[in-house]
């Protein structure tokens, strides 16, 4: 496996990404073991030819206490010494191996240090954030490095751990998050890892030590990405996944999981499978399939963007308000209506008839999802079948959860995962029991909808296709007739005369 991982790293180098490797030997690690394993890694890389690999086992030093390195932004007990050696190796396109061993600032001892601290110190150095690490730094200073100057561009942080990607708390197997939007999800995921539910603990789904590993890897990702541009990302995966061949002949969709997540992410800046795809769409589906164990072993992590949801489903579940009772409206002060209208107009490439739209949705609004600074969003409503009055629909439980508008700014479409973030918030947080919507049959976005819905229906004598995410809904269920009734008769609200979207 080591040779296969070394090959992946050399292929990443050919694609423009030069790696720096920090080994983590665990709590029982010794200086001797780390140096031996570092040498093995170096030799494995060297077998793939020039420019090879360089082992630098003296570039980490212990920082003196009460300095900016130990007390300032993102504190670390170690710092980078002999930076000219490190930079020379990287300029030569060599893959650098750095064992987490350090010499004390008094030059009297050499100790094993925490690998995460080493990674944080390296990131601070590359970002130009290493200040006053020692009053008397060891080694010759590099006069070309001015304080605060960015030394190198860190594009990816790759964490290879047998524990694999960050697990999904609500999955019944070992599936993991495919994408984590830190701004939105970090606190909730960390809480789930550190406070497992009783049923999970009883089942022994994830032992305490494994959950601690997952929490540590995610916390490290957050700390490192906090120092990097928003375009940088972290990948948490297994060594075996990193050893996969980057290119294979695929005979069916179910084998796509065997793609190398490192190569795939570098080429696309996306996870192997979109985070908004239903789990069943990306599982192998065949017991005994050798690939099934690798279905969800990689988690892509980004700083992402904040997500605002009104009303907040973590406080109270979305339920239909009583007719005549208080409810959220698009004209409420918490919603920036001009920016919302701009988002819709830009995404649909047509102008919304605002007055007509407000008349139609303001009294049956279920909620609104806003990604970032109105870069994406969704407007959801409670719709009554057109042959019922609101009171009857409410009392009989026939109000339909409906996705009225799903919009992403053109500048954010196809990148950044904005659509995935909004869609996941809708189906996991706001309407976990299902939501329906409609789209023109010739809409190019329909492929994306087909992949994420749990059912579709072409509405006879119309140009509409209806989609829904309601689980376990047979075609004989009368609920589908209510869905169809709503999707068939919703009146569009555009200021132009083009066919409705």
Predicted feature locations:
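Nucleotide/pyrophosphate-binding catalytic subdomain
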Residues: 1-241, 330-337
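Structured beta-strand/turn binding interfaces of compact recognition modules in eukaryotic regulators
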Residues: 24-25, 160, 383, 406, ...
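Short, charged/polar "capping" segments at the starts of alpha-helices
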Residues: 29-30, 242-246, 444-447
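Short, aromatic/basic amphipathic alpha-helical patches
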Residues: 36-44, 247-257, 447-454
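Fungal intrinsically disordered, low-complexity polar regions
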Residues: 66-84, 137-147, 171-175, 188, ...
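Terminal substrate-recognition subdomain of acyl/acetyltransferases
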Residues: 262-263, 270-333, 346-359, 409-410, ...
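A conserved beta-strand-loop-helix scaffold within acyl/acetyltransferase catalytic domains
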Residues: 332-414
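Conserved acetyl-CoA-binding loop-helix of GNAT-fold acetyltransferases
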Residues: 414-427
């Amino acid at each position: 496996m080591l040779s296969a991982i070394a090959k992946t790293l050399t292929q990443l180098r050919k694609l423009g990404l030069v790696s720096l490797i920090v080994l983590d030997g665990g709590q029982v690690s010794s200086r001797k073991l780390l140096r031996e394993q570092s040498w093995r890694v170096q030799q494995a890389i060297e077998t793939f030819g020039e420019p090879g690999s360089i082992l630098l086992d003296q570039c980490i030093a212990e920082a003196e206490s009460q300095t900016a390195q130990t007390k300032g932004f993102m504190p670390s007990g170690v710092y980078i010494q002999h930076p000219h050696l490190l930079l020379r190796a990287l300029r030569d396109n060599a893959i650098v191996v750095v064992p987490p061993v350090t010499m004390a600032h008094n030059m009297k001892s050499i100790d094993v240090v925490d690998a995460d601290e080493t990674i944080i110190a390296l990131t601070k150095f590359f970002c130009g954030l290493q200040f006053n690490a020692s009053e008397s730094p060891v080694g010759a200073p590099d006069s070309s490095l001015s304080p605060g100057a960015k030394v190198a561009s860190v594009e990816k942080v790759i964490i290879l751990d047998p524990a694999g990607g960050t697990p999904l708390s609500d999955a019944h197997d070992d599936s993991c998050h495919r994408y984590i939007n830190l701004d939105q999800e970090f606190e909730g995921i960390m809480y789930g890892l550190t406070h497992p539910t009783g049923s999970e603990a009883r089942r022994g789904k994830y032992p305490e030590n494994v959950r601690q590993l997952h929490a540590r890897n995610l916390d490290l990702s957050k700390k490192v990405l906090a120092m990097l541009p928003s375009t940088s990302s972290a990948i948490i995966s297994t060594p075996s996944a990193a050893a996969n061949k980057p290119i294979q002949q695929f005979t069916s969709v179910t084998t796509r999981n065997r793609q190398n997540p490192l190569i795939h992410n570098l080429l696309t800046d996306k996870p192997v499978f979109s985070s908004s795809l239903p789990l069943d769409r990306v599982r192998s589906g065949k017991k005994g399939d050798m690939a099934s164990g690798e279905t969800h072993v990689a988690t892509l992590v980004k700083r992402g963007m904040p997500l605002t949801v009104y009303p907040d489903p973590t406080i109270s579940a979305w339920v239909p308000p009583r007719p005549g009772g208080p409810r959220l409206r698009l004209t409420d002060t918490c919603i920036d209506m001009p920016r919302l209208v701009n988002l819709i107009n830009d995404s649909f490439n047509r102008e919304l008839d605002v007055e007509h739209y407000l008349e139609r949705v303001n009294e049956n609004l279920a909620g609104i999802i806003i990604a970032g600074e109105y870069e994406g969003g969704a407007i959801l409503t409670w719709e009554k079948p057109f042959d019922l009055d609101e009171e009857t629909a409410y009392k009989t439980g026939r109000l339909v959860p409906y996705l009225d508008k799903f919009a992403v700014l053109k500048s954010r479409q196809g990148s950044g995962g904005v659509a995935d973030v909004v869609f996941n918030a809708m189906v996991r947080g706001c309407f976990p029991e299902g939501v329906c919507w409609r789209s023109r049959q010739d809409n190019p976005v329909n492929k994306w909808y087909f992949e994420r819905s749990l059912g579709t229906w072409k509405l006879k004598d119309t140009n509409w296709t209806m989609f829904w995410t309601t689980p376990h809904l047979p075609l004989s269920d009368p609920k589908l007739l209510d869905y169809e009734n709503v999707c068939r008769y919703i009146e569009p609200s555009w200021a132009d005369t083009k066919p409705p979207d």
